[in-house]
Amino acid sequence: EAGEECDCGSPENPCCDAATCKLRPGAQCAEGLCCDQCKFMKEGTVCRARGDDVNDYCNGISAGCPRNPFH
């Protein structure tokens, strides 16, 4: 929703302040295939294995798993 940086779900989420829906200090992300312990995963980390096809990889600058353009 507008103004939210993360999903205000559980107060136990270590990355997101449930009261403000903002990322906690030092957190880059709160969820996503390329988010691990509140940080973006390193560029080149496989986020979606495709078996016989080309895998999808984290880009190091977002929590989402970008689709490989070669699919």
Swiss-Prot record:
Keyword Disulfide bond: yes
UniProt KW Secreted keyword: yes
Single GO MF annotation: toxin activity
Disintegrin domain boundaries: 1-71
Disulfide bond residue pairs: 6-21, 8-16, 15-38, 29-35, 34-58, 47-65
InterPro entries to which the protein is assigned, alphabetical: Disintegrin_CS, Disintegrin_dom, Disintegrin_dom_sf
Pfam families to which the protein is assigned, alphabetical: Disintegrin (PF00200)
Purpose: Inhibits fibrinogen interaction with platelets. Acts by binding to alpha-IIb/beta-3 (ITGA2B/ITGB3) on the platelet surface and inhibits aggregation induced by ADP, thrombin, platelet-activating factor and collagen.
PANTHER family: ADAM A DISINTEGRIN AND METALLOPROTEASE DOMAIN, ADAM METALLOPROTEASE
Protein name: Disintegrin applaggin
Annotated organism of origin: Agkistrodon piscivorus piscivorus
The organism's taxonomic lineage, starting at the top: Eukaryota, Metazoa, Chordata, Craniata, Vertebrata
